[in-house]
Each structure stands twice: as C-alpha cells, then as structure tokens.
Amino acid sequence: MSGIGEERPRELRWYHAGPMLFGDLGTSRLYVLGLAFYFTRHASFFHIIAVNILLVLVSCCYLIICRKYPEGGGVYSSARHSSKVLAVIGGLMLSADYTVTAALSCLDAFRYLGVEAEVSGFRLELACTLGAIGAIGLVNWFGPRGMGRVAMVVAIATIFLTFVVAICAIPHLQHMRVEFPVKERYNLSAWGDAWVGFTEVVLALSGIEAIANMTGIMVPPVRVTSRRSILPVLMEVVIMNLVLAAAMNALPDAKLINPEGHPQGTDNMMAVLATAYVGPTFSLVASFVFGALLLSGVNTAVTDLMAVQYMMARDGEAPRILTRLNRHGVPGYALIISLLIPSLLLVIFPDITELAGLYSVGVVAAITINLLATGYTRQFQLGGWERWMLVLVGGLMGAILITLLWTKPTARAFSLAILNMGLAARMVTLAGRANVPAATGRMFQGIGGLVFLAQGAITFFLPAQAWEFLFFSVANTIFLALLSGYLSRKIPEKVVRRHLENFDGDYDPITYHLVAANRPSTFIHGVLEDAQKSKAGVIIVFVRNLAHSLSGSAAHHAMADDQEAREVFETALDFANNLGVPLDLVYLPGGPI
C-alpha cells in the first residue's frame, strides 16, 4: 500500500452523504417496526411517535454539531476538547455500535432476500454475509463516492416502494387498533414498564452520529452540505415511520400474531406490510430492494468505523499506520480492520436474535457524550437556546443509557468488553510514545496486554448477568483510564501543523471585510467581532514580499511553508471558529515590481 498523505480529500457532496445517511436511518424501519410490536404490541404506535420526536430533537442537535465541527463532528472530535480519555471512550462506544450495525444489517439483508439454506452444514446466509462485507470493502477502497452513488439509487428505489405501500395502506387505517402504553395511569410500575418499552426501540439513532463523522470529507461549506444531507432524510423517515406504524397496527391480529401467541414479522415487518397491502409479487420485489438498503446501511457503518480509527490514529491514540492513505485518499489499513471486526462478530454470533441483544448501548452512550460535551464546551460561542437544547437532550439520552445498561446485560457486557480491550490497546500505543525509561514502557505494555487478555477471558467465561463480570469490567476501565492518563502526561507535546483552509462559519455572509495582515494581532479579533454583528465574512490577506522574481521553483512558494503566514492565519482561524464568522485565507507571494 503506498501512502500518499494523511489529509483525506473533501469529495462527499450532499447527494452522496444523504443517501448514505438514509442507508442507516432508512433501515431502521425494517426492524424497528417489528421490534416495537414485539415489545409493546398495539401500544407500539405511541412508542414510535416518541422515538420520532427523539429523532427530531437529536437531529436538530447534530445540525449544530456538524456546523461547529467541520473537521469531524463525531463524539471523538467533540469530547476531545474536554478530555482525551472521554473522547476515546466515546469513540470506542461508537465503534461497538458500528460493529453490531454492520453485522446485524448485513445478516438481516439476506433474510429479506430469502437466503436461508445450508450447504455441507455451513449456513449459506452467513457465507453471503461475509462475502458482502468484503465486496463493500472493495468498493470503498476506491473512495466513498462509489458507494454514495449506489446508496443514492437504492434510497430512491426504497422511497418509491415505501410510498406505494403507504398509499395502499391509507384506506385501511380506519381499522387501526391503538392502546395507550400505560394501562394503569396511577401505577408507577406501569409508567416504568412503558419507559423500558420505549428504550427497547431506540435503534434508529446511529445514522445521525455517522453523518457527523463524515463532515471531515464533505465538500465546503460543511454546514450547508450537512443540512442538505440530514433534513430531507429526517422528513421522509419521520413521516413514513408514522404512516407505516399506523398501517402495522391496522392489520388483523392473525397476520401479526401466530397461533402460539408470539409476534410475527419481527425481522421483516416491511415485507409483511407489502404482502398485506399490495401483494406477494410486489413484496418479493420490495424485499430485494429492502435487502439492498440494509447493505447500504452496512456501508455507512463500515465507512464510519474507518473514520473513527483514522481520527484516533491521527491524534496518537491508535497506531499511526491507520492514518496512511492509499492513492484514492482512503485509510486502507483502517478499512481492513473495519471489515474484519464485524466479520469476526458474525462468526461468533451468527444469529440475528443474538446480535440484536448487543445493540443500542454503544450509540446511545456516544450520542450522550457528544451532546453534553458540545453543550458544555467553551471553545466556541453557542446561542442560549442551542446550549440548552444540547444539554437537555443529552440528559434525556443519558437517562435512556442508564436504563439500557440496567435492562440489557448482554449489550452492557459487549460494550464493556469493547471499551476495555480498546483502552488496553491504547495503553500499549501510549507506552511506546511516552517519555519514560524503556523498562517502564515495556512494563506498561505488558500490563496492557494482560488486561486485554483478562477482559477477553472474563467476557467468554463469565455470564453477562453476573455481578463479578460487572465488577471486574468497571475496575478494569478505571484502572486503564488512570494508567493511560499518567502515560499521556509523559508524552511530549508534539507541534501538529494545522491544515489551513477557509472556514465556513455559521451563516452566509452578506458582505466581506478585507484585512491585510503581516503578524498576529488583536485587531483581527476586533474585525471578526464587527463582522459577526453585521453577518459579514472576513478575508485575511497575507502578502509575502520576495527579493526575487516569482519564477521557477519560487513560483511554488507555499503558504503552508511560511511560518509568519501560518501564525497569522492560525490566529485568525481560532478567532473565527470561536465566533462562527466565515473566513477566507488569501496568500500572495510576490517579487519586486
């Protein structure tokens, strides 16, 4: 693999990112509808309304996050300004979610496609699932736009077919049967059961965190690209989920519950609705498209699992080799790992029910950390209502997280295992970089390796419900966080050359202020403050006078190599980022006239 650099190119447009987001959010209805009925029966309509309200609130928060973090708005980027350990924890939690999402979506895709045979004792659907993950990785090797185009075609086909099902179902909605989630309004336990039922179906949120991780490769202005990516998808998902939830509850119980009293269609409810309201032939075609949509969701998960590794490695929290790009601007080694981890999970847990038990905790934890870290940060200005919304929605997500940790021991165990094994691997990396005696570094690396193996052992040999597992896992987390904190303080601060590019800001400027500067100055801050008040942009011009004519090699005199220019531009970018003012950088090298 020939690395050509470490800065990924910005080539993802809204019509690439939007379908990729739909590949995650849109897939939610393929299993959320069935799971909602499985857990809450005819009270599922109210639960889906509540999930949609939560989805709108979280999406509004992520519009703010994408605007404020154009270099990457995922949990790792936002939490890093508060705490390196917290950022790594958020990144690992998100990685756990992406791993399960990729494995679960890919396996469910072949359920929709009807692949369930066995060949020589080996399940054909599992073989197809592993092959599909490899094929998705091969396409991603050539950059995100390829799968973005495929995702766009699949998204358009899915929206059309879903619209047909919804239109055909509308005349039957008068038969909808709805039950209030709380059967005894004055019974506190009944309200608790309703809350737990709601948390069981909060599965549609990982796509929002995924789109935030893509801001680092979106074409500028990122705030516009992210908004155009999120809002149309959000509108379609919310409206169609409500209509389809009503259509599901309008079906007779004979089509929803089998003679033994167990819910049907838990993993393919959209196929059930297509058969009931349109017909079996249409359902067959729709199932093929729905399977393709699930594979699109796999692509989104793999892309963002790769992005998290890239950002952590770029900051020295993971091996530097993960930042090495191939000739197409893709971190190749990170891509390979992003394919191997969900494939290994599928080999260990080859059943949809088992995989579903690992879901939710990771993404809810990541979103909680992201919202609260952004809401409490002081590195940039936020409107009063923006800060309050981030904090309040983050608090709500925190309550959901606590509930999931209590009620889903398998998901809790899986998330703790990923967290501790990731922290142990991080400690090994930090020990190799820390300014400590060689023997001390080897000792820390040995401790990290032992903790890694110990966490793997207790995960496999202790039941997830056992208090011993919880005790040892939490103790490992605290132990690793403390040791890693010590090692981080022993690592010399490395001067990282900031990538200089124009800053989009929070608004479209109606005019521009032009400033010529040859050194950092508080005057620049004053101009930016005035520009913020009048919704203007600022252009900073640095003129480099050269004592020779600009020809030959001098014609390539670069802004990045001019230390004085870098100081001016970096100072201006810091001020602009804090105030949210659009800033353009102009570097003019010139010789004598």
Predicted ranges, named:
Residues A464, F503-E564, V568, F575-V586:
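Small/aliphatic-rich secondary-structure junction motif
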Residues G131-H172, S229-P232, T300, L358-I369, ...:
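Membrane-interface loop-to-helix entry segments
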Residues L33-G91, A103-A132, L234-L242:
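Extracellular loop-to-transmembrane helix junctions
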Residues M1-V32, S77, V88, G192-G197:
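Membrane-interface "cap" regions at the ends of multi-pass membrane proteins
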Residues V85-A87, F122-L130, V219-M240, Y310-V347, ...:
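Loop-to-transmembrane helix boundary motifs in multi-pass membrane proteins
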